[in-house]
């Protein structure tokens, strides 16, 4: 056999002797550890991916208003709601409906109602000065806070591999080097 490879991400980290001619880096390509069991002091991994968007609409509603399909969330007070243009068709897990969160202006905003095909809503009542086009962090850093892939995937009843592989073709890939945007790649137009 001219080329041998048996090492996946975990064995690259923990099993030196199995590297052979090639390795299959998999999840460590994203800067993520393959499991909690691997030695984290061997490779200092940093997440290579963030998932960000922006607010497209804001509306204030009174107490008792149903939000999203089938009114799966009903407001219990006057609430300011922001619409986020990402949904399960983009790979954002529907299982985060009414239980996930995002970061806006360095603060957590809870997801309210269902994750729809193309959008979902968050409660931004307590985020001062929030406005349309504000950046929304679904995974990554915002100020001194962070939502990790592992956190989001765990909340969705999943794991990091499934989350990163599930991000759909509709989501443009923006490549950044040294803080500067280098290229944007669109798979669907």
Question: Over which residues does each language-model region extend?
Answer:
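Active-site anion/phosphate-binding pocket segments in diverse small-molecule metabolic enzymes
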Residues: 1-189
């Amino acid at each position: 056999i001219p080329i041998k490879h048996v090492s996946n991400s975990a064995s690259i980290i923990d099993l030196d002797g199995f590297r052979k001619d090639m390795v299959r880096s998999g999840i460590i390509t994203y800067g993520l550890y393959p499991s909690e069991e691997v030695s984290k002091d061997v490779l200092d991994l940093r997440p290579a991916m963030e998932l960000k968007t922006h607010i497209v609409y804001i509306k204030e509603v009174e107490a008792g208003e149903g939000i999203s399909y089938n009114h799966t969330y009903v407001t219990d007070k006057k609430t300011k709601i922001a619409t986020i243009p990402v949904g399960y068709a983009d790979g954002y897990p529907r299982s985060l409906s009414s239980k996930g969160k995002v970061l806006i202006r360095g603060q957590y905003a809870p997801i309210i109602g269902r994750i729809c095909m193309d959008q979902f809503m968050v409660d931004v009542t307590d985020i001062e000065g929030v406005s349309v086009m504000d950046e929304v962090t679904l995974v990554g850093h915002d100020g001194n806070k962070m939502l990790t892939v592992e956190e989001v995937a765990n909340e969705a009843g999943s794991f990091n591999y499934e989350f990163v592989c599930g991000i759909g073709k509709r989501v443009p890939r923006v490549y950044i080097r040294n803080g500067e945007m280098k290229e944007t790649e669109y798979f669907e137009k």
